[in-house]
C-alpha cells in the first residue's frame, strides 16, 4: 500500500533570498540533522543570465532501524538523489528527491517547494509532499513502512527548526537582508544571440523535467491551503502525520464535493474519532455528509423552532463555560419526563431538538475559539441524575435514547470534551448496562461519575468548573435558567391518530406483548436465569382493570416443554400443587397497579433458576394473600364473561457478565462511584421494595 504525506504550508516570515541563504547552509553536511551523513554534487548548471541554478546531489542518510533489519538489508545508510531547481527571477525553489538504494524494492518520491507568500512578498512559504511504496523487502514490509514513516515525519519537524536555526545564525552574523536578483545589462551582440534558436537540451539535461509538472501543480498557491500557523492557532497542535491526514482528507473533499465543504475543525473531529486512520475517517465523513444533506441538517438552526412544550419541559440548556473555556451544557435528566415528552411531541421532534443542541454546541465552540484565541473544539455536559428512577427505563424511551446516541456518535464525533454525571442513583447502573454498548470507547473515557454528594468536595466539580459557574441547585453560586422539567400533563399527549401518523403506535406495539388477566387466571412469564447477579427489567402498561404484580423464584422448572435456555413461556405456569415458601418464593413484594398506570422496574437476581413475573386481578387484601387459585376458580374464569384486565408488557434480562462489566466501566470513570456500586450490589441480597415505579 502506498503511504503518502502532505504538509501544510509552513511560513517563514523572512524574504525568499534570506531563506535560500539559510537553506544552502545545510550542505554538504548538517550537524543539526544527525541522520544526514553528507552530500556531494553530481551535476550543476546555470542559465546564461544566472536566473536559474540547477544542482543535482547525492545524499547519504543513516538508517535508523533495528540492527537485525540493517543486517538483513546489508546496509548502514541509504542514498537519495536530490535535484534542486532554484529560480531567482521567479523566486522559487523546487526540490525533487528519490531513493537510489533498493530502488527495485522500495520507491520513495519527495517534492518540496519554497515560494513567495501570495499576500506578503517578504515572507516565504514551504510545502512538502512524499510517497512511499514498499514492493518487497525480505518479508519486513510492514516493519519497514512504520520505520520509514516515523523517521520521515521526525525529519519533517526537524527541517523547519534547522532553517530557523540558520536564519538566526545569519542575522546574528549581520546578514539580515540579501538583495533580490536583477538581470545583468545585456549588450547588443548578446541580445542577438539570445534571440536565436535555443538548444532544448540546455536545461532539460540537468534533471527529470517530465516530473516537474505534478510538483508545480501540487504546490501552486490557490488561496485555499492550510498553513501551519493557522493549524496551531485554530485547530491545536498536530503531529506532522496528523497534519498530513487533515490535508489529504480536505483535498479529497475539495475534489468530490464541488460545493461547500465542512469546516476544518469538523473534518478533524472525524480523524480523531478514528485515531487518524485516513480511510476509516473518510468513509465515516462521507456517510455523515450524505446524512446531513438528506435531512438538511445544515439549515437546522435556521429552520428548527422547538415546540413551546419542549421549551418548558425539556430540562436542558447552555450555561457559561467550564474551566478550560469549553461551552457548558446542563441536562437535568432525572427531572425530565422522557415518556411524557415522547407521548406529547414524538420521537422525531426530540431527535431534532438533540441535533439542534449539537449544532449549537459546534457554533459555540467556534465562538470560544475566536474569543479565547486558542482552539476549543468540544463542549462539556453536566448531567444531573437526581430523580432518575424506573420510569426512565420505559422501553420505547430507552430505544429512542439508543437511536439518539447512535446518530450523535455517527455524525458528531469528538464534540463532547467531558461528561460530568452527578447525583447518580442506584438505578443508574441498570440504565448504563442498556446504553453503554452503544457508546464509543473514546467517548466513555470522557465520563466522570459522582454518586451522592461527593461532587461537592475536592476532585469534584470544582476541578472542572469555576465556583461562580456551578449551578445553584448543586450548591454553587450561579443562578441557572435551565427549565426544571417535571411531569408532562397527559392532556398534552398526542391523540392516537397523531401517534399513528408518526408511526409511534406501530413501533411500540412491535416492542410489547399483550396479555389478558381473568379472575382466578393470572398471566405469568417465565424467565430462565443461568447465573446470579443478572438483572431482570420489566415495563408494562395497564390498559383495563386493576392488577397485582409479583415476582417469584423457583428452582423447579414449570411445565415449559422443551426449549432453549433464555427463551420464555407465558400463560399460567405455576403448578397447582406448588406451595409458596417451599416450592417457590416471592422475591418482590406484591404491587397493586391501577388502570392507566405505567410501571417500570428491575431486580438484581441472587440465584440462578426460573423467575416468574405474575399479573393477577386485584382483589381485596384477603384474596391477594392467597397464592394459588383453585381449580373451580380457573374453570369459572375461563367460561364466564366476567371482568377482564388487559395489559401490555415487556421484559428483558441483562446478563450477569454484561452487568458486572458495566459496573466495572462505571467504577473506572471515578473512584467516587464505588459507593453507588456497593449500594447496587447490596440491593440484590434481599427484596427491593423500591425496584418498581408507578407512573400515575
Curated annotation (Swiss-Prot):
SMART domains: CRAL_TRIO_N, SEC14. PANTHER family: SEC14 RELATED PROTEIN, SEC14-LIKE PROTEIN 5. One of its GO terms (cellular component) is cytoplasm. The gene is SEC14L5. Residues 178-214 are annotated as: Disordered. The lineage of its organism: Eukaryota, Metazoa, Chordata, Craniata, Vertebrata. Pfam families: CRAL_TRIO, CRAL_TRIO_N, PRELI. Residues 509-653 form the GOLD domain. CDD domains: SEC14. It comes from the Eukaryota. Residues 2-175 form the PRELI/MSF1 domain. It comes from Homo sapiens (Human). Residues 306-482 form the CRAL-TRIO domain. This is SEC14-like protein 5.
Amino acid at each position: 500500500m502506498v503511504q503518502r504525506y502532505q504538509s501544510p504550508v509552513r511560513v517563514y516570515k523572512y524574504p525568499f533570498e534570506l531563506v535560500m541563504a539559510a537553506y544552502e547552509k545545510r550542505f554538504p553536511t548538517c550537524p543539526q540533522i544527525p541522520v544526514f551523513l553528507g552530500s556531494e554534487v553530481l551535476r550543476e548548471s546555470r542559465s546564461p543570465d544566472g536566473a536559474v541554478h540547477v544542482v543535482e546531489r547525492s545524499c547519504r542518510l543513516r538508517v535508523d532501524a533495528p540492527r537485525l533489519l540493517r543486517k538483513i538489508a546489508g546496509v548502514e545508510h541509504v542514498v537519495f538523489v536530490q535535484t534542486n531547481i532554484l529560480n531567482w527571477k521567479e523566486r522559487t525553489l523546487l526540490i525533487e528527491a528519490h531513493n537510489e538504494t533498493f530502488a527495485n524494492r522500495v520507491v520513495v518520491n519527495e517534492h518540496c517547494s519554497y515560494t513567495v507568500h501570495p499576500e506578503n512578498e517578504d515572507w516565504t512559504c514551504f510545502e512538502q509532499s512524499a510517497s512511499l511504496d514498499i514492493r518487497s523487502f525480505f518479508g519486513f514490509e510492514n516493519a519497514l513502512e512504520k520505520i520509514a514513516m516515523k523517521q520521515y515525519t521526525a525529519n519533517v519537524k526537524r527541517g523547519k527548526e534547522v532553517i530557523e536555526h540558520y536564519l538566526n545564525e545569519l542575522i546574528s552574523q549581520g546578514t539580515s537582508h540579501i538583495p533580490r536578483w536583477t538581470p545583468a545589462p545585456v549588450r547588443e551582440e548578446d541580445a542577438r544571440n539570445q534571440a536565436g534558436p535555443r538548444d532544448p537540451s540546455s536545461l532539460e539535461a540537468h534533471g527529470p523535467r517530465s516530473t516537474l509538472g505534478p510538483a508545480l501543480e501540487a504546490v501552486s498557491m490557490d488561496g485555499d491551503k492550510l498553513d501551519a500557523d493557522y493549524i496551531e492557532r485554530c485547530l491545536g497542535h498536530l503531529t506532522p502525520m496528523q497534519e498530513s491526514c487533515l490535508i489529504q482528507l480536505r483535498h479529497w473533499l475539495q475534489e468530490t464535493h464541488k460545493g461547500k465543504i465542512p469546516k476544518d475543525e469538523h473534518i478533524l473531529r472525524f480523524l480523531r474519532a478514528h485515531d487518524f486512520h485516513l480511510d476509516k475517517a473518510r468513509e465515516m465523513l462521507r456517510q455523515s455528509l450524505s446524512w446531513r444533506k438528506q435531512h438538511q441538517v445544515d439549515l437546522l438552526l435556521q429552520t428548527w423552532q422547538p415546540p413551546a412544550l419542549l421549551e418548558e419541559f425539556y430540562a436542558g440548556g447552555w450555561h457559561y463555560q467550564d474551566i478550560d473555556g469549553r461551552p457548558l451544557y446542563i441536562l437535568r435528566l432525572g427531572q425530565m419526563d422522557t415518556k411524557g415528552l415522547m407521548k406529547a411531541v414524538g420521537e422525531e421532534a426530540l431527535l431534532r431538538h438533540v441535533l439542534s443542541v449539537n449544532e449549537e454546541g459546534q457554533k459555540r465552540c467556534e465562538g470560544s475559539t475566536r474569543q479565547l484565541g486558542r482552539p476549543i473544539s468540544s463542549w462539556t455536559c453536566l448531567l444531573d441524575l437526581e430523580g432518575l428512577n424506573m420510569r426512565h427505563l420505559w422501553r420505547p424511551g430507552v430505544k429512542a435514547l439508543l437511536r439518539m446516541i447512535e446518530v450523535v456518535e455517527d455524525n458528531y464525533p469528538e464534540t463532547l470534551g467531558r461528561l460530568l454525571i452527578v447525583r447518580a442513583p442506584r438505578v443508574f447502573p441498570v440504565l448504563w448496562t442498556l446504553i453503554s454498548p452503544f457508546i464509543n470507547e473514546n467517548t466513555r473515557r470522557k465520563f466522570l461519575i459522582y454518586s451522592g454528594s461527593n461532587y461537592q468536595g475536592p476532585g469534584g466539580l470544582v476541578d472542572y468548573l469555576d465556583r461562580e459557574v456551578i449551578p445553584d441547585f448543586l450548591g454553587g453560586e450561579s443562578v441557572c435558567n435551565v427549565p426544571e422539567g417535571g411531569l408532562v400533563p397527559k392532556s398534552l399527549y398526542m391523540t392516537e391518530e397523531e401517534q399513528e401518523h408518526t408511526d409511534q403506535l406501530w413501533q411500540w406495539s412491535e416492542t410489547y406483548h399483550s396479555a389478558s388477566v381473568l379472575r382466578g387466571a393470572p398471566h405469568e412469564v417465565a424467565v430462565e436465569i443461568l447465573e446470579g447477579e443478572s438483572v431482570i427489567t420489566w415495563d408494562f402498561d395497564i390498559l383495563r382493570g386493576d392488577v397485582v404484580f409479583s415476582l417469584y423464584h423457583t428452582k423447579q422448572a414449570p411445565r415449559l416443554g422443551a426449549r432453549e435456555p433464555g427463551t420464555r413461556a407465558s400463560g399460567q405456569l405455576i403448578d397447582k400443587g406448588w406451595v409458596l415458601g417451599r416450592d417457590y418464593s416471592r422475591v418482590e413484594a406484591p404491587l397493586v397497579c391501577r388502570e392507566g398506570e405505567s410501571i417500570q422496574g428491575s431486580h438484581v437476581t441472587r440465584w440462578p433458576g426460573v423467575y416468574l413475573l405474575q399479573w393477577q386481578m386485584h382483589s381485596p387484601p384477603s384474596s391477594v394473600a392467597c397464592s394459588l387459585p383453585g381449580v373451580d376458580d380457573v374453570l369459572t374464569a375461563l367460561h364466564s364473561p366476567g371482568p377482564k384486565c388487559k395489559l401490555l408488557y415487556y421484559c428483558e434480562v441483562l446478563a450477569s457478565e454484561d452487568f458486572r462489566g458495566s459496573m466495572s466501566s462505571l467504577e473506572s470513570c471515578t473512584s467516587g462511584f464505588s459507593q453507588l456500586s456497593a449500594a447496587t450490589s447490596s440491593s440484590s441480597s434481599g427484596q427491593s421494595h423500591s425496584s418498581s415505579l408507578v407512573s400515575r
